[in-house]
Amino acid sequence: PDAILLSWQGGQEGGNSVVDILSGRINPSGKFPMTFTVKLSDHKSHKNFPKNPKMITIEGLVKNLIFPPSETPKAHKVKDEDYTFYHEDVFVGYRHFDSKNLSVSFPFGFGLSYTDFKYSPMKLEIENDTINISLNIKNIGAFPGKEVVQFYTEKLNSIIKRPSQELKSFAKTKRLENNESINVSVKIPIIELSYWNETVNDWSLEKGEYNIKVGGSSRNISQILKISL
């Protein structure tokens, strides 16, 4: 198909909304809050998915009837049935797919529109332990629409294991007419660039260089600026 309309939980007006979008009365502007993979096994957590059919036994079913999951004695708990280890660590969702540069069906933050948007060069300043970012978004297509502008950060030459990029902020424009522009600005507290340091049991900020990225999805970055902290 040329496109797929994903109309989750539209409520009683969901049908009317779908018709409005398909007929061109309204321009879709939603973005995915997850990554759609090519294969289920591409998920880093795939090996730890619970309720593997091969693990279901008569003994296990009887145990679940006798002991609710919260009351199962520790000696009888079964891995990936009564409990699961999150071996993916901080590489959850798009953080894993983007860090490994895996091919995906639809990336995190992706969404189609009947129009196109142009991003002006970012303006960036650091003040009061906050990264202030602003840029203009222009509707350069023939159809009115809204854009969800996404801001990601990347630590260069990190001394710890961390994702290649992480979403730190986003902003949605108002409905823009053809050739209409609007200024979008966000504030990212520098503390948001910290990582959880298990050695000191607290948040720590890595000194050094960071990339500030902006784009329409995690795989559609329009520009990058480098800062030093």
Language-model regions, residue ranges each:
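Intrinsically disordered, low-complexity Pro/Gly/Ser/Thr-rich segments with frequent PxxP/GP/PP motifs
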Residues: 159-198
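Short acidic, gly/pro-rich beta-turn/loop elements at beta-sheet edges
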Residues: 104, 145-147, 159-161, 194-196, ...
